[in-house]
Amino acid sequence: LLPRAFVKSSRTDAMLDLQHGYVAVDSSSRKSGENVMSEIRGALGSFPALPLNAEVAPRSILTGWIAGEPLPDGLSLGEECEMKDPIEGGAVVKCQHQELRCDEIDKHLEAGKQVTKLALILDDHVSFVLGDDLVIRKLKFLDGALDQLENADQDGVRAELDARFALMSAEVRRLFLLLEAALKLSKAET
């Protein structure tokens, strides 16, 4: 008998928005995201893609939002953030389940800390944590988004999956377009 390696299968969902020129990969692992992009390139033959890049430092925008600068229409602050001292090896403050517009947070900002992760909510439909690396974490569709599914046709599991995907992709598209404008994301040269 020859030894056999165990095959581990996995599934990673992704959404291509060719109209707006981005790919959203549902993975917490950068390596998994790169594997998905490799598979897309293999299937299509060529697929030029670059990671997101902002013209303005995301830390300064996130810090401004938590300091009281106006958020883009539709966005509101969540109850979670991470702030870091900009010096190497500086202090890190993590807040969860906390009002972010308060004296305690203001004191950290006055001490020079910058926001590196910030929980945000889009129109009571989607909550997420945006990092200064432009990675969206903890993406969650809220009741406001899922209420729209109650009116969907109940023609079976396939129809429900199609409706869920359509709803989720529309919300992700709205989120991306809002963040693209707010963070001044640069487009790849074509």
Task: Enumerate the predicted regions with their spans.
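Intrinsically disordered, low-complexity, charge-rich terminal extensions
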Residues: 1-190
